[in-house]
Amino acid sequence: SLVGSEMCIRDRGLSYGGSLARTEATGYGLLYLTEEMLKCNGKDIAGKTVTVSGAGNVAIYAIQKAEQLGAKVVTCSDSTGWIYDPEGIDVALLREVKEVKRARLTEYAAARPSAQYHEKKNGEHGVWTVKCDVALPCATQNELDLEDAKQLVANGVFAVAEGANMPTTMEATEYFQKNGVLFCPGKASNAGGVATSALEMSQNSERLSWTFEEVDAKLKNIMVNIFHNLDDAAKKYGMEGNYVAGANIAGFLKVAEAMTAQGIC
């Protein structure tokens, strides 16, 4: 048995201890936290226009959950180009292109009359030139720079949450904060994947297999709690609304308290 062993294998197949909803977890979790962040600032994600970068696991399921919550996602991208679809990204078609055919977004554009395909060009700012309310970078590190941030702010963005690991440069992050944009760092907003891996381990330890809905509900609760932990930390230390500082403080305190309790420091 893997339970109780010194090593842990996660993201396994369902037939050997994996968990339902693990595939969707990072993208879904991103939206659950974003939804809560907006709600706590007097806004609702329903009816909002969202731009997403990427077309991999995180992006696809972020788009799917955003649309389930009533938002319209109008962009996605891959390494060769990006899509602007003013009618809203067709998630079923995107999944067919990316998960079944393993093809490029040119195939999405060819099958979707409302979609506009833009080939990637050096120096071009891609999806971040599109007017939106909420921006979700879900592609790669340092993909959203200062010029992108300026374009987004000029176009009226009011919230940015990271789906990828560190996709926003430090300069862009600071620009968002100075201009009153709600900004949540990936260390909090993309935690849904690793959180669901922990839920997978919980199921293994009890020899249980929860339904998709059970895992999804627990994931949402975790992401909502993460947001409130960082929000509370930011307020407590005099930095209300600074979710980067809140995430850093909350994370540090959790580790420090555990180390102190175990006599490590």
Model-derived regions: residue spans:
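Helical "substrate-binding/catalytic lid" subdomain
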Residues: 5, 18, 22, 26, ...
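Adenosine-phosphate binding glycine-rich loop
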Residues: 153-265
